[in-house]
C-alpha cells in the first residue's frame, strides 16, 4: 500500500493544473451578475444603467423570469419601463441578450420596444438576440395563471401577476412547452404543438376560451418579423464568443433573491431561480465565468402581493414609506407593502449568492424619519432562529428583534461622497455593511442616474 503524502495548497494546485491542463485561478471571469437581494423592486435598473455607462459593459443579458418583472431606468431625459428587455437596450454600444432561462411573451416584447421608443432608433435590431431555446408564453398560460389563483383560498393566494409566467415554467417542466426554436422551424408542427397545449389546459380548466386560429395567425406574424429582423439565435454560443474576446457581460437578474423558487419564502415565490445559480443556467455560462455578484438592496423593505413579511408596517411609518418612496409596482400597478429593512433575511441572501458588493438604493426616502429600525434576528416560540423558517405556516409566529437608529433628518439628495452624508446616516449604512459582511459600494440618493454615491470602484 502506497504512502500518503501531505501536500501544501500550492503543491496541490500545481498538481491539478498539470492534470487539468490549465490554471485553476486564471479563468476568464468576464461575467458580472446583478441581483435583487430582497423581494424585488430594489432599484436594479438604475444600478444596471450606471454600470453600463461607467464600466464598459459590452453585453447585458436577462437570464430568468418574463414580463412579470419590472425595471425602471431614468436616463436621456426620459423614463424607461422594462419588463422583458435588458436595460442595455438604451445604450448604443451595448448588445442585449434574452437568454434561454427567460420565458418570452412576444406580444409584450414588441409592445415594450414600441412603448420605450426603441423602434424609432436606427439599428436597434442589430443589438438584441433572443435565445432559440427560450420558452414562449401564450395567452392560454395567462388564463391558466388566473384560474389557478382564483381556485386558492384567500389566505393561500400567491399574489401572481397573472402574466402566465408560472404556467409557462410548468409547461417547461412538464415537457409540453414550446420554444422559440419551434416557432422559427416548421410552422405546421408548431401549430400542432400549440393545439395540443391548449387541449391539455382545457381538460383542466374547461372555461378557458382560446381562438386557436387567431392565435396561430398572430404567431405567424411574429415569426415573420423575428426572421426578417434576425432576432433569434444561439445566445449561448454568442456569449461564449464575446467572453473569449474579453468582452464584459452583465447578467440582469429579475425579481429578487427572496422570491427564488428554492430559497425564497415558498410557496409565495416566483417560478424561477432568481439567485446567482439562475444566472449560469439562464444564459449558459459556467460558475467559473462569474466574477462580481452585486446585490441590490433597498434601504427599507417592500413586497408586492401576498406572502410573509415580518417587518411590514401597518402604521403611519408604513404609509409614509409608500408615499415618499412612490411604492407602486411597475408591472402590476399595485401598491407595495412597506416595512423596515430585514437584515436577518439579507444575510441569508448574501450567504446564498456570495455578493461581492452591495448597492443600497433609495436611502434618501428615510431622510425625514425620526426613528429608523432594522431587523437583526428572529424568534419562533421563544427560540432564537439561526435561519429563516422553511415551513410556510411558521412565518406567522415569528417575533422580530430590532435595532433602533435615530434618524438624521437632513436631505441626502445631491450628496455624491460618502463622507458628506450626515453622520447618523453613515452609521446606518455601516451597520448594514458590518451585519451582512459585504461592502456597500453604491448608494442611491435619488431617482436620476447621477444620484449615486460610489464608495470604491
Curated annotation (Swiss-Prot):
Active site as annotated = 41 (proton acceptor), 71 (proton donor)
The record's annotation in Gene3D superfamilies points to:
Adenylosuccinate Synthetase, subunit A, domain 1, Adenylosuccinate Synthetase, subunit A, domain 2, Adenylosuccinate Synthetase, subunit A, domain 3
- What's the EC number here? 6.3.4.4
Top-level taxon: Eukaryota
Q: Which reaction does it catalyse?
A: IMP + L-aspartate + GTP = N(6)-(1,2-dicarboxyethyl)-AMP + GDP + phosphate + 2 H(+)
Q: What is the annotated localization of this protein?
A: Cytoplasm
* Coiled-coil parts of chain: none
Q: List, alphabetically, the SUPFAM superfamilies matched.
A: P-loop containing nucleoside triphosphate hydrolases (SSF52540)
Q: Which Pfam families match?
A: Adenylsucc_synt (PF00709)
Q: Which GO terms describe its biological process?
A: 'de novo' AMP biosynthetic process; IMP metabolic process
Gene Ontology MF terms in the entry? adenylosuccinate synthase activity; GTP binding; magnesium ion binding
Annotated positions binding Mg(2+):
41, 70
Please state which protein family the record places this protein in.
Belongs to the adenylosuccinate synthetase family.
* HAMAP family listed in its UniProt record: Adenylosucc_synth (MF_00011)
The protein's assembly and partners: Homodimer.
Name the UniProt record assigns to this protein: Adenylosuccinate synthetase
Amino acid at each position: 500500500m502506497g504512502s500518503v503524502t501531505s501536500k501544501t495548497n500550492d503543491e496541490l494546485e500545481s498538481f491539478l493544473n498539470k492534470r487539468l491542463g490549465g490554471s485553476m485561478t486564471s479563468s476568464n471571469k468576464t461575467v458580472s451578475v446583478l441581483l435583487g437581494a430582497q423581494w424585488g423592486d430594489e432599484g436594479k435598473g438604475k444600478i444596471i444603467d450606471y454600470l453600463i455607462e461607467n464600466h464598459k459593459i459590452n453585453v447585458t443579458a436577462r437570464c430568468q423570469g418574463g414580463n412579470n418583472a419590472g425595471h425602471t431606468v431614468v436616463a436621456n431625459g426620459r423614463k424607461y419601463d422594462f419588463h422583458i428587455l435588458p436595460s442595455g437596450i438604451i445604450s448604443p454600444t451595448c448588445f442585449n441578450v434574452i437568454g434561454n432561462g427567460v420565458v418570452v411573451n412576444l406580444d409584450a416584447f414588441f409592445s415594450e420596444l414600441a412603448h420605450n421608443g426603441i423602434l424609432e432608433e436606427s439599428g436597434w435590431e442589430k443589438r438584441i438576440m433572443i435565445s432559440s431555446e427560450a420558452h414562449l408564453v401564450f395567452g392560454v398560460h395567462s388564463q391558466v395563471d388566473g384560474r389557478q389563483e382564483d381556485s386558492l383560498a384567500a389566505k393561500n393566494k400567491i399574489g401572481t401577476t397573472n402574466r402566465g409566467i408560472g404556467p409557462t415554467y410548468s409547461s417547461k417542466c412538464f415537457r409540453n412547452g414550446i420554444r422559440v426554436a419551434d416557432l422559427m422551424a416548421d410552422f405546421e408542427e408548431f401549430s400542432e404543438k400549440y393545439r395540443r397545449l391548449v387541449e391539455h389546459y382545457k381538460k383542466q380548466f374547461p372555461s378557458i376560451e382560446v381562438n386557436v386560429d387567431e392565435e396561430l395567425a398572430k404567431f405567424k406574424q411574429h415569426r415573420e418579423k423575428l426572421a426578417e429582423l434576425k432576432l433569434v439565435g444561439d445566445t449561448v454560443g454568442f456569449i461564449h464568443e464575446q467572453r473569449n474576446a474579453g468582452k464584459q457581460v452583465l447578467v440582469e437578474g429579475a425579481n429578487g433573491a427572496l422570491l427564488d423558487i428554492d430559497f425564497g419564502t415558498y410557496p409565495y415565490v416566483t417560478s424561477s431561480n432568481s439567485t446567482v445559480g439562475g444566472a449560469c443556467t439562464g444564459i449558459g455560462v459556467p460558475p467559473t465565468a462569474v466574477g462580481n455578484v452585486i446585490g441590490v438592496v433597498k434601504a427599507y423593505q417592500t413586497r408586492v402581493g401576498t406572502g410573509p413579511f415580518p417587518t411590514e408596517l401597518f402604521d403611519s411609518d408604513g404609509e409614509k414609506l409608500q408615499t415618499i418612496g412612490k411604492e407602486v409596482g411597475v408591472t402590476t400597478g399595485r401598491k407595495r407593502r412597506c416595512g423596515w429593512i430585514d437584515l436577518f433575511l439579507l444575510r441569508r441572501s448574501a450567504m446564498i449568492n456570495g455578493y461581492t458588493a452591495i448597492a443600497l438604493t433609495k436611502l434618501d426616502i428615510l431622510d425625514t424619519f425620526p426613528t429608523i429600525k432594522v431587523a437583526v434576528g428572529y424568534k419562533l416560540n421563544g427560540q432564537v432562529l439561526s435561519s429563516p423558517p422553511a415551513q410556510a405556516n411558521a412565518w406567522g409566529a415569528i417575533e422580530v428583534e430590532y435595532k433602533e437608529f435615530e434618524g438624521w433628518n437632513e436631505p441626502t439628495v445631491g450628496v455624491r461622497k460618502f463622507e458628506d452624508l450626515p453622520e447618523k446616516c453613515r452609521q446606518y449604512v455601516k451597520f448594514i455593511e458590518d451585519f451582512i459582511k459585504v461592502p456597500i459600494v453604491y448608494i442611491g440618493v435619488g431617482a436620476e442616474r447621477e444620484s449615486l454615491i460610489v464608495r470604491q470602484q
